[in-house]
C-alpha cells in the first residue's frame, strides 16, 4: 500500500489482514487485528455488516536505535491501518475511548496523531458522561497532525470508504484504553454516517444530553514546537524531548 506522506521510518501497511512490513532497522511488538465483533457495542447499528477485520494496530514501533530514548521518556509510537468500506451506514472507525489514567503521570494523557494516507476525521468530545461537553470533528489528510487533549473521548474515522486510512501517533508508554463510558451510551455523542455519495454527515446519539458539533481543520501546533510537513517520528529523532508535552499537555485541540 503506497503512503501519501513519509512517516520517517521504513514501514509499509499491507492490509488489515496482514498488518505491516518493517525494515530491518526497525523494532515492533506485534500486530493486533481489531474484529468487527469487538466494536459492535459502540456502533449505531450493532448488527451491521462490515469487514471482519476493521483495522490492524501495532503499538510500540520505530527504529531500533530509538527504543532506549522512547523508553527513557515513557513515550510510545503506534501505527494503525483501516479497512476500506463501511460498517453498515457508518464509515470504518474506532470505537471511541478515553485514555486510562497513567500510573507514572497520574492523569489521562493526550495523543498526537499524524495521517499518512486516506482521509480522516478525529472526533473528540470533552466527556464520556451524559453531558459530552464540547464536541469536535477535526478533518485531516496526509501529513496533517491532530492532538487529542487529555481526558477526552476520541474516535478515529475514515472519511473515504473507497480507500484505507493509515496513521501514526505518539502517546504515553503506560497507555490503556477505557471504553466503559462510551459503551454505556451505545457509542460516541455524534454518529458519523455515510450518504449515498460516500460523504459524511453527523447525527446525535440520543443517549447523551443535547450538544453541538464543531467541524474544523487541524490547528497549527507551532506553539508546541512541531514543524508542519515533517513527520512527527523524524521530529522525535531530531529532538527526543520534543514530545514530552504528551505527558504534560493541558490545552485544547
Put a short name on every predicted segment.
Residues 140-160:
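Conserved metal-binding segment of the jelly-roll/cupin
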Residues 85-88, 119, 173-175:
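Short, charged/polar surface micro-motifs in flexible loops or helix N-caps
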Residues 107-126:
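Short, conserved beta-strand element in jelly-roll/cupin
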Residues 1-102:
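A short, N-terminal "cap"/entry segment at the start of jelly-roll beta-barrel domains
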Residues 249-253:
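Conserved small/polar residues in nucleotide/adenosyl-binding loops
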Residues 130, 159-247:
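Double-stranded beta-helix
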Amino acid at each position: 500500500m503506497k503512503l501519501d506522506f513519509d512517516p520517517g521510518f521504513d514501514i509499509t501497511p499491507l492490509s488489515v489482514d496482514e498488518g505491516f512490513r518493517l525494515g530491518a532497522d526497525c523494532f515492533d511488538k506485534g500486530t493486533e487485528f481489531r474484529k468487527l465483533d469487538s466494536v459492535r457495542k459502540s456502533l449505531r447499528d450493532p448488527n451491521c455488516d462490515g469487514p471482519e477485520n476493521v483495522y490492524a494496530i501495532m503499538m510500540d514501533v520505530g527504529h531500533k536505535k530509538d527504543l532506549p530514548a522512547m523508553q527513557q521518556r515513557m513515550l510510545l509510537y503506534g501505527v494503525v491501518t483501516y479497512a476500506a468500506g463501511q460498517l453498515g451506514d457508518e464509515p470504518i472507525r474506532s470505537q471511541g475511548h478515553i485514555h486510562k489514567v497513567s500510573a507514572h503521570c497520574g492523569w489521562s494523557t493526550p495523543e498526537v496523531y499524524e495521517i499518512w494516507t486516506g482521509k480522516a476525521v478525529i472526533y473528540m468530545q470533552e466527556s464520556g458522561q451524559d453531558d459530552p461537553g464540547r464536541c469536535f470533528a477535526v478533518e485531516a489528510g496526509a501529513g496533517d497532525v491532530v492532538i487529542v487533549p487529555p481526558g477526552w473521548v476520541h474516535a478515529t474515522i475514515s472519511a473515504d470508504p473507497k480507500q484505507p486510512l493509515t496513521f501514526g501517533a505518539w502517546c504515553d508508554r503506560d497507555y490503556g484504553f477505557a471504553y466503559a463510558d462510551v459503551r454505556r451510551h451505545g457509542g460516541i455523542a455524534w454518529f458519523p454516517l455515510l450518504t449515498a455519495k460516500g460523504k459524511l454527515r453527523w447525527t446525535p446519539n440520543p443517549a447523551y444530553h443535547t450538544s453541538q458539533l464543531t467541524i474544523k481543520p487541524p490547528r497549527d501546533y507551532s506553539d508546541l514546537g512541531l514543524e508542519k510537513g515533517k513527520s512527527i517520528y523524524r521530529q522525535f529523532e531530531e529532538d527526543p524531548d520534543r514530545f514530552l508535552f504528551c505527558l504534560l499537555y493541558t490545552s485544547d485541540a
